[in-house]
Design a protein with these regions (language model features):
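Rhodanese-like catalytic fold shared by cysteine-dependent sulfurtransferases
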Residues: 1-35, 42-83, 92-137
């Protein structure tokens, strides 16, 4: 078996259209008004730590919570022009999630390169302390 798997090809295609954020730039993006969304499962957040200032949304309800036309959208999203940065554990599912949000019209959606683990490894003070909110549909 050789070559690239179908999921690798899908991921490569997704990332080709994203202007992904480097861990060192996350605080700057946040300060400029980006909404940072942590989609890691609760078990990973409990094990590795929370991302202060991020809104916590389970991946399985992300589109409903971020789509401004959905009756279930979070109050931080009022239109499709807001910069949204998705953070998962290692930066894989977040790329696919960002593309899904772009398909909903959020043309500035993107993700964090390497996810939370890259942020942690860089020992970057990513976001100012802020309250985290768990979100569900």
């Amino acid at each position: 078996m050789g070559g690239t798997s179908a999921i690798d090809a899908l991921l490569d295609a997704a990332r080709a259209d994203l202007d992904r954020v480097q861990p060192r730039n996350l605080a700057t993006e946040f300060a400029a008004g980006a909404l940072v969304v942590d989609t890691r499962p609760v078990e990973q957040r409990q094990r590795d730590g929370e991302l202060p200032g991020a809104v916590v949304i389970d991946r399985n309800v992300l589109e409903w919570r971020i789509d401004p036309s959905s009756p279930h959208h979070i109050p931080e999203i009022t239109d499709t022009g807001r910069r949204v940065i998705i953070v998962c554990n290692e930066g894989y599912s977040s790329s696919l999630a960002a593309v899904s949000l772009r398909r909903l019209g959020l043309h500035r959606a993107t993700d964090l390169v390497g996810g939370y683990q890259a942020l942690r490894a860089a020992q970057t003070a990513a976001l100012p302390d802020g309250g985290l909110r768990g979100e569900s549909l």
